[in-house]
Amino acid sequence: MADTPGTDGPNRIVFTGARLIDGTGAGPVDATAVVVEDGRFGYVGPARQRPTVAGETVIDLAGRTLLPGFFDCHVHFLMDSNADFTGRLLRNRPTVTVFERAQRLRETLQAGVTTVRDLGGIDAGYRDAVALGLTEGPRMHVALRLISHTGGHADFRLPSGFDPSELVGPFSELADDPAQARLATRRLLRDGADVIKVCATGGVNSPADQPEDEGLTVEEIAAVVEEAKRHRGRPVAAHAQGARGIKNALRGGVTSIEHGYLIDDEGIDLMLDRGAFLVPTLSTFHLEGGHFTPQAAEKKRRLAESAMERLSEAVRRGVRIALGTDAGVGPHGRNLRELAHLTELGMTPIQAISAGTLRAAELLGLADQLGTVEQGKVADLIATDADPLIDIGALGRPDHVVMVVKDGRIVKDGLPGRDAVKRCPR
């Protein structure tokens, strides 16, 4: 097989002729050239003005659109949305489960998502395996386990006494005072967490509470935030759906509100004052079946009645939005469906794209390296045969993502007439 750019071939690739949406929030630019060299963006500008170098590989993308590699700031590779998920865990050997999770990583990358935050359920070894080139997937920030109070969102013990998390390994850190919350944070940091996740409210899938119920107290959340700051300023994400818990989380100093479905005006004020991010995870409202119990489905239905109105108000007032899907609750590899859902809140397609690129990079503290197509940044890039400004929903269908580049390597090549890229570890 001939050398393939991004594997063992030339290290300078020129993508030319495409329309570029660079992720900064600026409008599209036609007939561009994007040069990738040694894993980073070089020249980005008009195709007719680009410098040429002997031996470079030129890929003609006329009629396509280039965008930065996307982020999904809220996934769970632990699980999938198949109704038989629990049954498979019981039947499969643990090694099979590991390979199933690796497949979810690949599906996510092939969909155009090159960076994710996994907010609970897998250990740091998956992150490390991707970074070492042992398996294909997006780069990852991981939370490992959720900090919850006894009987809260991440206490999954059923009335029978059985804890379903025993099937998948530790999923929770239960803490019932500030000292326990601090200790739980230290355990997570010891185990390799990049981000700490706290449960500030109840939730849809938790058996013993409602989304409006409060979770950890302000004092408990503040203890987590303080401890995380002592360790390289680790961010804290808050599962928060009800209005009171959202405000508790913000007063405790969290970096992001996950879901935020019932946020009220005071909560929006707090978000604006503190510069916190909102990750709406709208994709969960568009799911049917899966592993929702009848009780969880009813909670979801009730939340949906108010969530779109409240989240739209947050968008209208300028709260910083980052894209996240809760993939795992929903399907993996369909992450970019969330872009169309964000436009339902009043965002323009360009704003939705920025939520999945630059804004998400800012949330993860990676905006100096990722999130936009700019000279000097890490070369994460996708090409689509759709026009996302006319049909942004097309990006949610992986067949419309015809090329994916991560760290300057082509990891998906669906362009007609080109040999498929060998998808294997470095």
In which residue ranges do the predicted regions lie?
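C-terminal cap of metal-dependent C-N hydrolases
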Residues: 38, 362, 375-422
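Active-site mouth loops of central-metabolism enzymes
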Residues: 86-99, 165-183, 235
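Histidine/acidic-residue-rich catalytic or RNA/ligand-binding cores of hydrolases
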Residues: 81-85, 128, 154, 207, ...
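Metal-associated gating/positioning segment near the N- to mid-region
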Residues: 64-132, 150-156, 219
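Histidine-rich, glycine-flanked metal-binding segment
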Residues: 2-14, 20, 24-67
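Histidine/acidic residue-rich metal-binding segments in metalloenzymes
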Residues: 179-278, 300-320, 368
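Divalent metal-dependent hydrolysis catalytic cores, especially in the metallo-beta-lactamase
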Residues: 100-126, 137-146, 193-206, 234-235, ...
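His/Asp/Glu-enriched, well-ordered alpha-helical/loop segment
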Residues: 230, 304-387
